[in-house]
Amino acid sequence: MSGGSADYNREHGGPEGMDPDGVIESNWNEIVDNFDDMNLKESLLRGIYAYGFEKPSAIQQRAIIPCIKGYDVIAQAQSGTGKTATFAISILQQLEIEFKETQALVLAPTRELAQQIQKVILALGDYMGATCHACIGGTNVRNEMQKLQAEAPHIVVGTPGRVFDMLNRRYLSPKWIKMFVLDEADEMLSRGFKDQIYEIFQKLNTSIQVVLLSATMPTDVLEVTKKFMRDPIRILVKKEELTLEGIKQFYINVEREEWKLDTLCDLYETLTITQAVIFLNTRRKVDWLTEKMHARDFTVSALHGDMDQKERDVIMREFRSGSSRVLITTDLLARGIDVQQVSLVINYDLPTNRENYIHRIGRGGRFGRKGVAINFVTEEDKRILRDIETFYNTTVEEMPMNVADLI
């Protein structure tokens, strides 16, 4: 295809290395599959592991290194691939922490995404003392100005309109900004932010490093890459298609965190009809729940990133062979557990980000396997569950009494 696409692009004005159907061809093959081998600052590594990451995702294995090396990078990736942490880690690695000036700018299409990015940056940069301000419409402009004037945050993340406004009024100084990230570029352009994005580019240093992330590559995105990026590294990460079709999703209103354990014990008989995976949000909690279940004489296995690979392999083998029936684990292994016979998943904790929901309970579409997912929901979780329903355009119903018949 590559020869043809080059001819097509010459005639139609697209950049080299693009398919006419808007899929980029990767031109970077270096893969680093371990955070420890990326030469990151010690304080940043601590933040990465404390956040719960164990192994870099496909995009992180490919894109962090060229970003850190200062290349312009175009990454074609959907949400749920770990793209936010990719550029968050790259920015944090390049920060000069002692220097109290804004050194990186991130644009996102919506306030919600901007705030989500800010959260990830602050969490990963926690041990470094990195500061990050979210510049978003719908908040008080005067407060924003005072904040930006009082102390320049290391990183500003925001929506194009508000960021342009702050640059224009000179409350946000472009002088020391060395890295500019456009997240969900296709979304931003389809929402009509093109002029503001171009105007922001005009205000930034011409030597700035540009990192652009986009799920699709329509012409208006390609135009940005041609106009503002120099010899970009191109990275394409295909997302596995996961589906919730055929999965019956239920919730149990446990009301309070401390009532989850009894609820789980009541369900144990049901779990062992088949094989079940129970997801929790932290490794510490996995250990805690495993101990509690053992103390009550329930047989369960646990799996998380603190264990060495040998130990994990043994546990996975036992689980795959069916000799262990209930597995307690964290999100990071959600992507790695493809156990054909798991037909029941319990979210003891709802996932902290909604993309992980489909990684926990979704199935590869081509197998079309049936399954049941049960979500433990406290009062505080109700909003998160609604958010998940909206995001996936799905419904999660209250668990019926005869759930055993459905498994």
From Swiss-Prot:
Resulting phenotype, V181L:
In a breast cancer sample; somatic mutation
GO terms in the biological process aspect are: cellular response to leukemia inhibitory factor; cytoplasmic translational initiation; negative regulation of RNA-dependent RNA polymerase activity; regulation of translational initiation; translational initiation
- Cellular-component GO terms for this entry: cytosol; eukaryotic translation initiation factor 4F complex; perinuclear region of cytoplasm
In its UniProt record, a GO molecular function of this protein is: ATP hydrolysis activity
In terms of superkingdom, the source organism counts as: Eukaryota
Q: Where is this motif: DEAD box?
A: 183-186
Q: What is the effect of changing S2C?
A: In NEDHSS; uncertain significance
Region ranges (Disordered): 1-22
Tell me if Ribosomal protein is a UniProt keyword of this record. no
Instruction: Name the reported effect of L344F.
Output: In NEDHSS; likely pathogenic; dominant loss-of-function variant unable to fully rescue lethality in eif4a2-null Drosophila
The disorder this protein is implicated in is:
Neurodevelopmental disorder with hypotonia and speech delay, with or without seizures: A disorder characterized by global developmental delay, intellectual disability, poor or absent speech, hypotonia, epilepsy, and structural brain anomalies. Inheritance is autosomal dominant or autosomal recessive.
- What family, per the record? Belongs to the DEAD box helicase family. eIF4A subfamily.
The protein in question is named: Eukaryotic initiation factor 4A-II
